[in-house]
């Protein structure tokens, strides 16, 4: 009986289907509703680098107060020519955080115990200055950095002090307590020194006397990191990178805000994805600001309006390097990438080693932001190597041995390359 009912039901369904009207096929292009709203962006693979120039100075991280410098000259494959101890290197509780600064044939360094040293180009010590105090005792606190302008050297310390030194003698001109920690270098331009504190505050000091001119705070808070982003200055405009992921544009002389932009987003599945800090120092090139976070975002921002030009789902460790239509970046996932500067599209990528033992994920390596010099791209790593790449294709060309491993970004001046090792040595290459 049941089988007859099933058969009749099936026949009825077939009858109804047969009686249905034919579906009208609407003409036009079919689009997949499941496709991403992010349209694919095409990258220009053509590469036109800036003209190679001999630069005499390297006054800030990435070369200048704007964190942009034109293509430095560097001939052949550099080899080590000398190395000298700068003081205390990396220790269990203390880390080197200051890149070498170069000006007027002097190389300035800061060790992990707040010792500042000036070297000449032959590696001889010119002077040393011990900046430890009751506020910054030895063997307990590290962090900070260096910046040069107007024959003086600005030093920030992890203890929250800003000290101005005579660059020729090392004499202390003044010191100021900002009442907060400082883990990143200062930015020094037009008679003003700007620092970022760990409490999401920017402080501008008059270089003549060390007095506070203005302060700015982020609207939100975030976790800081050692050697975090530093302000970028172009003319009378300062770009402030906060640990909250906010980027603020203000006037250098008054601190008056022009615009604010928050670089939102996080790297899913990574603990670093929750650290929103702008770790990719703002870089000012022409009418655009480039900045990246530790949580997987990189943005190009219009310098006048503060509106985003493009956003890339890639973080940045340290400043990007710009050369004409190319943007080179070390991402938060330890990948070296070349992007199209105009739209952020990827041209090539190179996976840098992360672990000494990849199978067990032990012995973690770190790498520092790329530097373009002499038509080659250089990346220094804690794995005791400086990698040399073809900037057009991303091909690994050479490996330069680096005793002690890298503890800073490379600095280049007068066709020489300088770097700090984890053992606390300044090493020169040519």
Question: Where do the language-model regions lie?
Answer:
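Bacterial signal peptide processing site
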Residues: 19-22
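Blade/loop signatures of beta-propeller domains
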Residues: 27-38, 45-81
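Short coil/turn segments that connect the beta-strands within blades of beta-propeller domains
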Residues: 55-56, 104-105, 150-151, 190-191, ...
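Extracytoplasmic beta-rich repeat domains
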Residues: 82-101, 128-147, 174-189, 212-234, ...
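Structural signature of WD-repeat beta-propellers
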Residues: 111-112, 150, 157-158, 197-198, ...
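Short loop/turn segments that connect beta-strands within beta-propeller blades
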Residues: 120-124, 166-169, 206-210, 252-255, ...
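Loop/turn-rich, solvent-exposed surfaces of beta-rich toroidal or solenoidal domains
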Residues: 328-341, 345-388
């Amino acid at each position: 009986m049941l089988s007859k009912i099933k058969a009749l039901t099936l026949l009825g369904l077939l009858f109804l289907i047969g009686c249905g009207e034919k579906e009208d096929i609407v003409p036009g292009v079919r689009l997949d509703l499941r496709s991403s709203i992010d349209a694919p962006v095409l990258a220009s693979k053509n590469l036109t680098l800036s003209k190679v120039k001999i630069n005499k100075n390297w006054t800030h991280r990435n070369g200048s107060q704007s964190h942009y410098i034109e293509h430095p000259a560097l001939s052949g494959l550099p080899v080590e020519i000398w190395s000298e101890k700068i003081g205390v290197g990396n220790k269990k509780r203390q880390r080197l955080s200051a890149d070498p600064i170069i000006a007027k044939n002097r190389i300035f360094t800061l060790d992990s115990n707040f010792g500042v040293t000036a070297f000449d180009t032959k590696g001889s010590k010119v002077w040393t200055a011990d900046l430890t105090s009751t506020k910054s005792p030895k063997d307990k606190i590290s962090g900070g950095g260096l910046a040069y302008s107007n024959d003086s050297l600005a030093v920030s310390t992890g203890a929250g002090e800003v000290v101005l030194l005579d660059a020729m003698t090392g004499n202390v001109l003044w010191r100021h307590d900002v009442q907060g920690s400082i883990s990143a270098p200062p930015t020094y331009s037009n008679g003003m020194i700007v620092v970022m504190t760990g409490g999401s505050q920017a402080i501008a000091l008059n270089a003549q006397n060390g007095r506070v001119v203005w302060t700015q705070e982020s609207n939100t808070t975030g976790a800081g990191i050692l050697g975090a982003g530093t302000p970028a200055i172009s003319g009378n405009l300062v770009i402030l990178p906060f640990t909250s992921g906010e980027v603020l544009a203000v006037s250098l002389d008054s601190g008056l805000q022009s615009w604010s932009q928050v670089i939102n987003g996080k790297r899913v599945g990574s603990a670093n994805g929750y650290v929103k800090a702008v770790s990719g120092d703002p870089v000012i090139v022409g009418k655009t600001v480039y900045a990246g976070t530790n949580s997987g975002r990189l943005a190009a921002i219009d310098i006048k309006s503060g509106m985003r030009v493009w956003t890339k789902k890639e973080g940045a460790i340290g400043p990007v390097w710009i050369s004409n239509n190319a943007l080179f970046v070390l991402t938060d996932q330890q990948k070296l990438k070349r992007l199209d500067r105009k739209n952020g599209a990827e041209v090539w990528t190179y996976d840098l080693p992360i672990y000494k033992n990849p199978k067990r994920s032990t012995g973690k390596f770190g790498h520092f932001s790329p530097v373009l010099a002499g038509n080659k791209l250089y990346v220094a790593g804690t794995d005791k190597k400086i990698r040399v790449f073809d900037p057009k294709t991303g091909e690994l060309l050479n490996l330069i041995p680096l005793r002690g491993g890298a503890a800073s970004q490379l600095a280049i001046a007068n066709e020489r390359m300088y770097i700090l090792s984890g053992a606390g040595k300044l090493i020169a290459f040519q």
